[in-house]
Amino acid sequence: MQKNLFTSESVGRGHPDKICDQISDSILDAVLKIDPNSRCAIEVMASNRLIIIGGEITTQGYVDLVSKSWEILISLGYTENDFTIISNVNEQSKEIANQVDRQDDNIGAGDQGIMFGFASDETKSFMPLAISIAHDLVKRAEKLRVENKINGLKSDMKSQVTIDYSDQKNPKIDTILMSLQHDKDVLLDNFRNDVKKLIIEPVVNDYNLNSNYKCFINPNGSFSIGGPIGDTGLTGRKIIVDTYGGAAHHGGGAFSGKDYTKVDRSAAYMARYIAKNLVAAKVAKKLEIQLSYGIGMIEPISINVNSFGTSKFSDLEITDFIRNNFSLSPKSIIEKLNLKNTKYFPTSFFGHFGRDDLDLPWEKLDQVDKIKKFFK
């Protein structure tokens, strides 16, 4: 019988793209700490033994960008002999600043774009099942790496989880794949056994799902050369890992390195916040919200809702509720989600959504009662 399969992946902190995301967001946090009104758009490239920091920063303070980069790299097991770091950062374009820096309710979007928010009742965090398991696998692996619980485990790693939805009410794990960097002298059979017993099995047990899944650990054999030395990394190259694992649309804009005035980030967070509260209020079992903005414009150009046939209310009814009950101007989003005071670095790995381990404002369920009263 043909199976109904869906797959999502996640990556660890030492993945080259994620190293770049972490450097970008650590710089963002440092800049906002000294000047909460700073503007920041940091892009990092890591290739072989060279790391380049580019982008724009406008701030009243000073941050040593190279030192911030080393903090991340050293935490991942590298030394100052491993890389050369070059910084080439400019100020924000004055034409963009003219739209963003207005000090009243007329703050406009810093760019055009489309953003999506999504929620599903599949998991307690209102995230799709496949990406939730994939994140938990690399999260546990990183914890064991830091604690030195698995011999030779290093920080570059990937997970991939395939869910069988042939029975929609009882999804099953079909396949789990993990590739994890390790020291050269590691015995691969022992390493694979440790990964299965100490990482994969405990995570699967947490979900109370089937144990008869296919499992592949380092299927290509040895994986001793990793991180930027093995592959080039760039900020913003893991946007599906950062969001919903492919279970929802993505507008294309990355998050890391961008301050709260960038609607690529702030509006995507707001769309998630609204979708999660609506699903938690049982308005729908699954919900996707699209927002679109134009540069310099205060309100979104469009709001679109897709409940995938899981709601007794029409998508237009839900759209009208959003339009009439949530202020979606950039200024209102910043204030509602307290984005000036949020620490962004912790979101730069293991996903920006469904993070029960973090106290993120866009994950709060503080609109549920209000929504339930409206949708009686």
Swiss-Prot record:
Its cofactor is Mg(2+); K(+). Keywords: ATP-binding, Cytoplasm, Magnesium, Metal-binding, Nucleotide-binding, One-carbon metabolism, Potassium, Transferase. K(+) binds at E43. Its EC number is 2.5.1.6. Belongs to the AdoMet synthase family. PANTHER family: S-ADENOSYLMETHIONINE SYNTHETASE. This is S-adenosylmethionine synthase.
